Amino acid sequence: MLDLKITKNILSKSTFEQITSDPILCTAPYLQSNSLIYLPVRMVPTVQKSSLTIFPEALLSSFSYTAYPFDFIGLYNREKYMQLGGFDYTITNPYWQNLDFSLRGWLWGEKICISSSIKLMYDEEIPLEDTTVDYMQLRFYLKNTAPIFINDHAYIPISRIFNYIHNASTNLFSAITDFKDARKWVEKNKYRFKMDMPHLVDNWERRRS
């Protein structure tokens, strides 16, 4: 995260109390560039050609849901953060790490919103997100996109191993190991899932303000 201007009165007492009393995973701020231009920080998940894509949109209302907080910036509910397991340190690309944690929250029934009551401005240039499709993206895929939700739990169909091996940049043994580990992780947490990625994307419109 780059330098931000933090002022003494950036958050009023009433706003802080409202945010801390609301059981939301993360409340993100409005963000401005150093030229006072508001950034399109509402991130909207969609599917294009069978692949998950995130589109940034301008904020049109005082309260909006977002797929993830841009640049990790937000007020996090500590208890919910811990329940989700925090950020996955094995995903070293910041973009995919942020997206992994945030969408895990959504898939497990949590919410992330943007509040107009909090506004921050960058002192320097706006950070660029590295959305390169690489090994880190594949780790994100296994934990978030590969699982299917049915009835009351999630699982990764064994049939998805073929597509994963085809796209993996690692050798066959490593790809199979990664896939097996991901299936074990989803099996361990299967009842924490409340939906899968297609359901989240399909129902996003009703969450948009």
Regions found by a protein language model. Give the residues of each.
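A short, conserved alpha-helix in the catalytic core of glycosyltransferases
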Residues: Y68-G85, I91-I118
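Short catalytic/ligand-binding loop motif for oxyanion handling, primarily in non-cytosolic enzymes
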Residues: I6-K8, N34-L39, Y68, M121-E124, ...
